């Protein structure tokens, strides 16, 4: 479906789309939190999940830029890793199906679909808002998704019915008791570091899981632990915009 999708070229002066890109960057944390929990599900819940990012190269007449979709996403708090889903229109320095890495600040959109309902898709809705009803129908048919009201962008599952889902993922609330029991039986894993120096506390902070972070701290996780590039869990919480997590990790005087 997505591999054959049209790449949309948008002029830099298109203010609605540019504003949409800014909103996507500010809310990317919700996208990554959902993917973080998707990896813990026995049965996947997402139809797909992708990020749109800016790719560019120097051309004869100046810089060539294209916004294209990436899937198979991993995020380390600074960079997004994935596989390019689109076939570039003009760029020759990257190919469809190639593994790519982009700074999180270079994204222009994110979207995941759960039970046929799209979340994110800020630039998509901005462009749909400039279409006629007939054009929107054709656009949605090409995607195979009903994007609904172009003025509405959902961030998290059932956010209208359960606004608390913006603060904490429902899976986090549901499994925190079991997680605490695991910590009581094996707190040593909190001090394990991967090849890049990340501890479990780093990963939970990046994903915005405040309940998990709180439990880890209570069982001895070291908030001063740094990655190989010198980042603490607090650094990542601040970068992502998880204030509730940052408050837990702030040094106590």
UniProtKB/Swiss-Prot annotation:
ANK repeat start and end residues: 196-225, 229-252
Key words of the record: ANK repeat, Repeat
Matches recorded under InterPro entries: Ankyrin_rpt, Ankyrin_rpt-contain_sf, DUF2314
Pfam assignment, any one: Ank_2
Native species: Neisseria meningitidis serogroup A / serotype 4A (strain DSM 15465 / Z2491)
Entry keyword annotation includes Cell cycle: no
SUPFAM superfamilies listed in its UniProt record: Ankyrin repeat (SSF48403)
Protein name per its UniProtKB record: Putative ankyrin repeat protein NMA1343
Presence of the UniProt keyword Repeat in the record: yes
